[in-house]
Amino acid sequence: MTNLTFYGAVNEIGGNKILLEDNGTKLFLDFGMSFGTANKYFSEFLQPRKCSGLGDFIEFGLLPDLQGVYRSDFIKHMGRPKEDLNIQGLLVSHAHADHASYINHLHEDLPIYCSDETYCILKALNDTSSSGFNDITDLSVCFETHVKDGKVIRTKGEKLDRKYKPFKFKEKFHIDEIEVEPYRVDHSLSGATGYIIHTSSGTIVYTGDFRFHGRREKETATFMEACKEAKPDVLIIEGTRVDSTNSKKELEVEDEICDISSKAKGLSICNWSVRDTDRMLSFLNAAKKLGKKLAISLKQAYLLDELAKCGDSIAPKTGDEDLTLYANRKSWGVIGDSNWCDKIRDEDYDSWERPYLDRAVCYKDIRANQKDYLMFCSNFDLKELIDIKPAEGSVYIKSVCEPFDAEMEMDWGRIMNWINHFGMNVESTHVSGHASGPQLKEFVEQVNAKNIIPLHTENAKAFENWSKNVTLLGKVGESYVL
């Protein structure tokens, strides 16, 4: 018998956590954060307590209270008896937080299966993040003590490598008796994967997040054809944009960026999702066409160098002559000041940032040559504008999704205050990382699964317009038996 239990993404977008059980083998499909549930109780300044281990997360339903799943140091600190690992693997569809950010809570010996690119992205996040994505690819054991001079004192715990098992697309592998076929799909970051999973009771397709309008749309079409040939018993499909008919292409965004920046009389300030290398390529190609340079953050440079190790064919390379690195002012803020030696400058930056500094530009370079640059500027980087002082005719190119909750509305209102303060125009161009309604309809009809379980959507009922075999989940924790 094969059983699926849905611990997240039920009647909401994100938070995928699906437990698959088949003849004694247990696998999780993704282990992400539910933004909706998390934002009900926590914020940037009100975070779950580390001292409670998993307790705060379990209290508010952010994590299921399961045995043999979570890291040993947290379990011990919570006063629970030792729990041996009783789950055989985690399949990660991609590296977005709503699918992967709670990996840091999982058992240190759990095998984690993902694409090479997904591992590289998670490693970059782990290495460069000050919070949130720590303990994703390695784990620092917490709450350790030792005895010195007859006294118990705290000690720094051992650092353990997590048990990642990166795979190649289209190469089948087994977890016990379960056979897994991973396929690349088009999404708004590299390495996104859809799975065809063969169990003792039948075949399951898990789409993860996907689309047909990016630079890898042919890969999604290949996955769809493979799913059709597999004749699945169950299709677990995302439905983020089930109500949308907009299927604008990524290449159209590239053209619009080029048009917007060509009209700018000053600096082109650009905001897109930091890990979306498809969008980064759109900005880079636009810069090339205009004879400009694209300035990206040091975090993005580190990510690109990690992706280069696994042979990502689409992500830009940090050696590209039209790509430059921008170093923010930090701590003492002496970068660009010749009165200070490199050693003092370097102390402002983390060890992973320092190798990039000698080839990075700073605010002085951008300020003096504003027409020559498209510059990445996340919400956290807005402070750089104080020193850059955007010239008259500068433009802010917004290339992210529209605000969809009150907190995002407040954030955008604050950003607009900065934009207005510096007298910049705002232009928008964006396409989603998710399939539109017509694209979802085509996928459902082509695959023709015996049963369909919509997930990662606020309107699962819409799928009933396309199939009579739809199972609607009512609440988190519900199960489905094949």
Where are these regions (language model features)?
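Cap/insert and terminal regions of metallo-dependent hydrolase folds
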Residues: G214-K299, A391-S467
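Binuclear metal-dependent phosphoesterase catalytic core
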Residues: I13-G15, L473-L482
